[in-house]
C-alpha cells in the first residue's frame, strides 16, 4: 500500500517482531514490485506450510523494499511470490515502530461500520482513489517465528491489512472503486489501462 496517509499513520499502532531495518531507505527497492497488468498480481496465493529462515529472509527483503518504495504495506504477490505473506508499517514516520509481519492471515470478524478513504498501491503508483471498507477487523495469523497470533485492528491499520490481504486473492484496490469515471481518469493519467481492472463492486 502506498504511503499517502502520513497524518493518520502517526496515530496508528502496530505490533510484531522483526530484525530492525532502517526506514529511511534510498535508491530502488531490492525486489521488483510488479505493476497493474502483470498476471502474477491476479493469482491466488498459497498458504505457507513451514515458517523457516527462508521465509524470514524474504520478509526482511520485503520490508526493505517497502521502505525503499515509501510504502506502508507490501504483499508477497507484488514481488511475484504467491505466498500468504504481508509486511505492514503504518507508522512509517516513526523510526522506533516495528513493522508487522503477517503469515497466513485470516480475518475472523469485520466491524459493521464502513468508511470510505483514499488508497494507493505500490503496484499502481500515482493512482489514489476512495475505497469503502469496514473500519475494524479481527484476524489471526502466524508471526515470523511461526507462532499463532490474534489481533484487532482499526483505522488505517485495519484498512492497510484488508488492502494487502486482497492481494493474496488476486484483488487490487482499483477493483473496489465505485466511481468509474474517476477510476478511468486516474488510470489514464498514470499510464495504466482500464481493461486490467476487474470490477467487484
UniProtKB/Swiss-Prot annotation:
It catalyses: N-terminal N-formyl-L-methionyl-[peptide] + H2O = N-terminal L-methionyl-[peptide] + formate. Removes the formyl group from the N-terminal Met of newly synthesized proteins. Requires at least a dipeptide for an efficient rate of reaction. N-terminal L-methionine is a prerequisite for activity but the enzyme has broad specificity at other positions. NCBIfam families: pept_deformyl, PRK00150.1-3. This is Peptide deformylase. It comes from Prochlorococcus marinus (strain MIT 9312). GO terms for molecular function: metal ion binding; peptide deformylase activity. Fe cation binds at residues 121, 163, 167. One of its GO terms (biological process) is co-translational protein modification. Its cofactor is Fe(2+). InterPro entries: Peptide_deformylase, Peptide_deformylase_sf. The active site is at 164. It is an enzyme of class 3 (hydrolase). Residues 1-24 are annotated as: Disordered. Keywords: Hydrolase, Iron, Metal-binding, Protein biosynthesis. It comes from the Bacteria. Its EC number is 3.5.1.88. Belongs to the polypeptide deformylase family. Binds 1 Fe(2+) ion.
Amino acid at each position: 500500500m502506498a504511503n499517502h496517509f502520513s497524518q493518520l499513520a502517526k496515530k496508528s499502532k502496530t505490533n510484531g517482531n522483526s530484525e530492525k531495518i532502517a526506514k529511511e531507505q534510498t535508491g530502488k527497492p531490492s525486489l521488483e514490485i510488479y505493476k497493474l497488468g502483470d498476471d502474477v498480481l491476479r493469482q491466488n496465493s498459497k498458504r505457507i506450510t513451514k515458517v523457516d529462515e527462508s521465509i524470514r529472509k524474504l520478509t526482511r527483503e520485503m520490508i526493505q523494499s517497502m521502505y525503499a518504495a515509501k510504502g506502508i504495506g507490501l504483499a508477497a504477490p507484488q514481488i511475484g511470490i504467491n505466498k500468504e505473506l504481508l509486511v505492514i508499517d503504518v507508522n512509517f514516520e516513526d523510526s522506533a515502530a516495528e513493522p508487522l509481519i503477517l503469515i497466513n492471515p485470516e480475518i475472523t470478524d469485520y466491524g459493521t461500520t464502513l468508511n470510505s478513504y483514499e488508497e494507493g498501491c505500490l503496484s499502481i503508483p500515482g493512482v489514489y482513489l476512495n475505497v469503502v471498507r469496514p473500519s475494524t477487523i479481527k484476524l489471526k495469523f502466524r508471526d515470523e517465528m511461526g507462532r499463532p497470533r490474534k489481533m484487532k485492528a482499526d483505522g488505517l491499520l485495519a484498512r492497510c491489512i484488508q488492502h494487502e490481504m486482497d492481494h493474496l486473492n488476486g484483488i487490487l484496490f482499483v477493483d473496489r472503486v465505485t466511481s468509474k469515471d474517476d477510476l478511468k481518469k486516474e488510470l489514464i493519467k498514470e499510464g495504466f489501462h482500464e481493461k486490467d481492472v476487474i470490477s467487484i463492486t
